């Protein structure tokens, strides 16, 4: 029971964390471009 619950939590959090990392990296990249310009 606990293993399935943990696996479900990990599978549910993985895409959210990946999306957060991508969004933060994209925002930082855009900010750097604006500062360079």
From Swiss-Prot:
<keyword id="KW-1133">Transmembrane helix</keyword>
<dbReference type="InterPro" id="IPR003683">
    <property type="entry name" value="Cyt_6/f_cplx_su5"/>
</dbReference>
<dbReference type="Pfam" id="PF02529">
    <property type="entry name" value="PetG"/>
</dbReference>
<protein>
    <recommendedName>
        <fullName>Cytochrome b6-f complex subunit 5</fullName>
    </recommendedName>
</protein>
<comment type="function">
    <text>Component of the cytochrome b6-f complex, which mediates electron transfer between photosystem II (PSII) and photosystem I (PSI), cyclic electron flow around PSI, and state transitions. PetG is required for either the stability or assembly of the cytochrome b6-f complex.</text>
</comment>
<comment type="similarity">
    <text>Belongs to the PetG family.</text>
</comment>
<comment type="subunit">
    <text>The 4 large subunits of the cytochrome b6-f complex are cytochrome b6, subunit IV (17 kDa polypeptide, PetD), cytochrome f and the Rieske protein, while the 4 small subunits are PetG, PetL, PetM and PetN. The complex functions as a dimer.</text>
</comment>
<dbReference type="GO" id="GO:0017004">
    <property type="term" value="P:cytochrome complex assembly"/>
</dbReference>
<keyword id="KW-0934">Plastid</keyword>
<keyword id="KW-0249">Electron transport</keyword>
<keyword id="KW-0793">Thylakoid</keyword>
<keyword id="KW-0472">Membrane</keyword>
<keyword id="KW-0812">Transmembrane</keyword>
<dbReference type="GO" id="GO:0009512">
    <property type="term" value="C:cytochrome b6f complex"/>
</dbReference>
<dbReference type="InterPro" id="IPR036099">
    <property type="entry name" value="Cyt_6/f_cplx_su5_sf"/>
</dbReference>
<feature type="transmembrane region" description="Helical">
    <location>
        <begin position="5"/>
        <end position="25"/>
    </location>
</feature>
<dbReference type="GO" id="GO:0015979">
    <property type="term" value="P:photosynthesis"/>
</dbReference>
<keyword id="KW-0813">Transport</keyword>
<dbReference type="GO" id="GO:0009535">
    <property type="term" value="C:chloroplast thylakoid membrane"/>
</dbReference>
<keyword id="KW-0150">Chloroplast</keyword>
<keyword id="KW-0602">Photosynthesis</keyword>
<dbReference type="GO" id="GO:0045158">
    <property type="term" value="F:electron transporter, transferring electrons within cytochrome b6/f complex of photosystem II activity"/>
</dbReference>
């Amino acid at each position: 029971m606990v293993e399935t619950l943990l696996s479900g939590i990990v599978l549910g959090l993985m895409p959210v964390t990946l999306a957060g990392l991508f969004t933060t990296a994209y925002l930082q990249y855009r900010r750097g471009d604006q500062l360079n310009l």
